[in-house]
Structures are given as structure tokens and as C-alpha cells.
Amino acid sequence: MHALDALDALSIKADIPDFSPGDTVRVYVNITEGDRSRVQVFQGVVIARRGFGVRQTFTVRKISFQVGVERIFPLHSPSINRIEVVTKGSVRRAKLYYIRKLRGKKAKVKQKREL
């Protein structure tokens, strides 16, 4: 198992910002189509984080043309170019799955106040 731990340590990214469920993030993902490569931006609310170490993932939800879209990203994936935290949210839960049922202004996450 020590060899696997060493391999995991090499794959962990160091430039990941501190974010939690309720925060609005902008994820820049490298998309390769044939011989061309481009960067796609996915911005939404983090509704869950799970896993530990290299296997850690986070789920981002956004509304696109009145349809909810969720995407699960591996945190240490090489296809993720960078992650930006747009706003910090104030929530009392670790998993925000209840937001899936809410519509309109009720689906908003309250912004955390700066002290």
C-alpha cells in the first residue's frame, strides 16, 4: 500500500482554492475534440464534496435555459485547468441536495458576510 500512497501524493494538485458547499465556483475544464483543444467554463453552486485525497470529487449545479445541470468533477483531475471561487455561500449543511427541488429565488444560496 505504500507504493500506492506515493503515487497518490504525486497526483495531488497544490493550487486548489479552499471552497465548500454553498460557494459559487467557476471551473475551467480542458476539452479535447480530435486534434483541437479548448477551455470550457462551468460556473455554479457547489452542492457536495466527497472522497479523500486523490479520489476527492465535487458536484457543481447551475441553471442553463431553465434546466438544472449538475456536473461531478474529480478535484485533482489533469483536465481541470483552474478553479475560481466567485462568492462564498452561507449554508448549514454539507450536502445541498435539497436545492434540486427548489425553483426561482428559493434556490439561491445566501452570501456569507465579511467581518
Swiss-Prot record:
The record's listing under PANTHER family reads: LARGE RIBOSOMAL SUBUNIT PROTEIN BL19M, RIBOSOMAL PROTEIN L19
Q: Which domain of life is it from?
A: Bacteria
Q: What is the lineage of its organism?
A: Bacteria, Bacillati, Actinomycetota, Actinomycetes, Micrococcales
Q: What is this protein called?
A: Large ribosomal subunit protein bL19
Provide this UniProt record's keywords sorted from A to Z. Ribonucleoprotein, Ribosomal protein
Q: Which Pfam families match?
A: Ribosomal_L19 (PF01245)
Instruction: State the gene name recorded for this protein.
Output: rplS
Q: Which GO terms describe its molecular function?
A: structural constituent of ribosome
Give the similarity note: Belongs to the bacterial ribosomal protein bL19 family.
Q: What does this protein do?
A: This protein is located at the 30S-50S ribosomal subunit interface and may play a role in the structure and function of the aminoacyl-tRNA binding site.
**GO biological process: what's one of them?**
translation
Cellular compartments per GO CC: cytosolic large ribosomal subunit
